[in-house]
Amino acid sequence: MQSQNIRIRLKAFDYRVLDASTQEIVNTAKRTGAQVRGPIPLPNKIEKFTVLRGPHIDKKSRDQWEIRTHKRLLDIVDPTPQTVDALMKLDLAAGVDVEIKV
């Protein structure tokens, strides 16, 4: 019989908030008796934007901005019902996007 896995993918702009949320999920899963694989750091997505500084002329004067999206992957192997309940009740930081696949 095939074991059931829960794959959790986290995304955030701030890596410190992301790492804290990841550690909170790992601690919750281990406390309820599940085995955790990860966190696996995935490649960062870097979006760069170049805008003109002035509203009129002077094309040589520009600002460059970038947004870095940090990602982590967690696998929870053979989760118990207590693990699923604890993860559903878990309250994470506001800046973290969570995707869950069963």
Swiss-Prot record:
Q: Which InterPro entries match?
A: Ribosomal_uS10, Ribosomal_uS10_dom, Ribosomal_uS10_dom_sf
Q: Which UniProt keywords apply?
A: Ribonucleoprotein, Ribosomal protein
From the record, give the transmembrane residue ranges. none
The protein's superkingdom reads Bacteria
GO molecular function of the protein, one example? structural constituent of ribosome
Q: Which GO terms describe its cellular component?
A: ribonucleoprotein complex; ribosome
Which SUPFAM superfamilies does the UniProt entry name for this protein? Ribosomal protein S10 (SSF54999)
Q: Which GO terms describe its biological process?
A: translation
What's the family? Belongs to the universal ribosomal protein uS10 family.
Please give the function described in this protein's UniProt entry.
Involved in the binding of tRNA to the ribosomes.
> Subunit notes for this chain?
Part of the 30S ribosomal subunit.
- What protein does this entry describe? Small ribosomal subunit protein uS10
Q: Which species does this protein come from?
A: Paracoccus denitrificans (strain Pd 1222)
